[in-house]
A protein has these predicted regions:
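Ferredoxin-like iron-sulfur electron-transfer modules
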Residues: 1-18, 29-49, 67-77, 182-208, ...
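Cofactor-cradling patches in redox/metallo enzymes
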Residues: 119-173, 303-378
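Short Fe-S-cluster ligation motifs
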Residues: 50-61, 84-86, 229-245, 263-268, ...
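A short, flexible N-terminal coil/short beta segment enriched in small residues
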Residues: 36-38, 62-94, 249-281
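Peripheral docking tails and interdomain loops at the edges
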Residues: 175-191, 197, 358-406
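Local cysteine-cluster metal-coordination motifs and their immediate loop/turn environment
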Residues: 17-28, 45-59, 143, 148-157, ...
Length: 409
């Protein structure tokens, strides 16, 4: 980690009561406790900024840059005034890509919500119990928490912790006379969608899946064990017919999103145009406020569920779509939430770089490892890349060149 990095999480020792709750609840053992004095300190090298310690501290002695209590309350208050909605939907980043589909998830649970306040977080476990009651005080009538399944949680214990808090809060609210439907939990994990009619039985997905979730079948298409699938997206990259894709990150949908963005920004004579493929867990602020990123840096952010889902085809296609440079932001090997199969991602990047080198476009692409624990690290690397691309002439590729060796047929 950069020595000049500003830490995203800090313990205020003047407020700390030495209760050690944070020490016992941290899923990454990132909080050290002195056995003699009881003093607790955060080991930033281990910290994943899940926010679970922050939400558990009874005296609010832990300061956190992202999604703090006051910021969350202010957001809900502003959205109440803006939308008039009385329903708050809390959703984990792992089960709700920026493209939406929240309505579909709610409808599948029998909930018909036309107007709601969306609050998207890296983990549901970082919501303080006090915030639930604050949201109700601000005028919220119903709160729906869309949680990942326990085994799917990217922060290990986040789902379990939030479920326990919701259960206790719900029991208390009922004693106070609130409706049973005031708080509701929905379990949902974003996994692959498999269209067997498109499958040709090549079994590439069987070979590439790092979690053993896909099994070859004799004289039949592969079988997916959805309980084992973690939605990393490795299988989607190797499927030649897009028969298997991660819901919310479908190839054609992603292609249309950045192609239309490039067309719109080009029409506004923006230069340089930067496209950022960003792992959901490597950066928080840019993915939460993509409009701000566009206004400040003329950059478009596209989420990917994991480094393994970074498709070389999209990188090449985006350059042909009008972007002057493409930047990929992923977690380091130590921080990766889905470590299995990391070598697959590395091989994909090697292939991508070889193709870009042959096309004389290698300087137009950069891969960075970033962590939200270091405040401002993403912006620093984006600034460096922006200046580099700005020093080059605008990229103008002939449409005919788009038929390159990477492109899926």
């Amino acid at each position: 980690m950069n020595e000049t990095c500003t830490a995203a999480v800090n313990i205020n020792q003047d407020y700390c009561g030495r209760c050690s709750i944070c020490h016992s609840i941290c899923p990454y053992e990132a909080i050290k406790r002195d056995l003699e004095t009881g003093k607790v300190e955060i080991d930033l090298q281990k910290c994943q900024v899940c926010g679970i310690c922050y939400s558990a501290c009874p005296v609010m002695a832990i300061d956190i840059v992202y999604y703090d209590y006051d910021g969350l309350a202010k957001y809900v208050e502003c959205m109440h005034e803006k939308t008039g909605s009385e329903t708050l939907v809390l959703m984990c980043r792992g089960n709700s890509p920026a493209t939406g589909e929240i309505e579909e998830i709610l409808q599948n649970e029998g909930l018909k919500v036309d107007n709601y306040i969306p609050l998207r977080l890296p983990c549901s476990g970082r919501i303080p119990t006090e915030f639930i009651f604050k949201a109700l005080k601000l005028g919220t009538k119903n709160i729906v928490s869309i949680q990942c399944e326990n085994e799917f949680c990217r922060f290990k214990q986040g789902t379990k912790i939030n479920a326990q808090r919701i259960m206790l809060s719900k029991a208390l609210l009922q004693q106070l006379g609130f409706s049973e439907d005031t708080l509701k939990v929905v379990k949902y994990s974003r996994k692959v969608v498999y269209e067997t009619e498109k499958c040709v039985g090549c079994d590439k997905c069987v070979f590439i899946c790092p979690y053993g979730a896909i099994e070859a079948q004799e004289f039949a298409t592969p079988k997916i064990t959805y309980e084992v699938c973690v939605g990393c997206g490795a299988c989607a990259l190797v499927c030649p017919h897009s028969a298997i894709q991660v819901k919310g990150f479908e190839f054609e949908d992603v292609l249309q999103r950045y192609s239309k963005s490039a067309e719109r920004l080009k029409a506004e004579s923006k230069f340089p145009l930067i496209l950022v493929f960003c792992c959901q867990w490597s950066e928080f602020t840019a993915l939460d406020d993509p409009k701000s990123l566009t206004l400040k840096k003329k950059a478009i952010a596209i989420e990917i569920p994991c480094f393994k889902a970074l498709d070389p085809v999209h990188v090449v296609e985006s350059l042909h779509s009008g972007f002057d440079g493409v930047m990929a932001v992923v977690c380091s090997k130590e921080d990766c939430k889905l470590r299995e199969g990391g070598d697959t991602a590395e091989r994909n990047i090697d292939v991508l770089r070889d193709v870009l080198k042959k096309m004389n476009l290698l300087e137009r692409f950069e891969l960075f490892t970033v962590s939200p624990r270091c405040v401002g690290e993403f912006n620093q690397k984006l600034d460096v890349f922006f200046k580099k691309i700005a020093s080059m002439p605008p990229l103008k590729l002939a449409v005919a060149e788009a038929k390159n060796p990477c492109i899926k047929s």
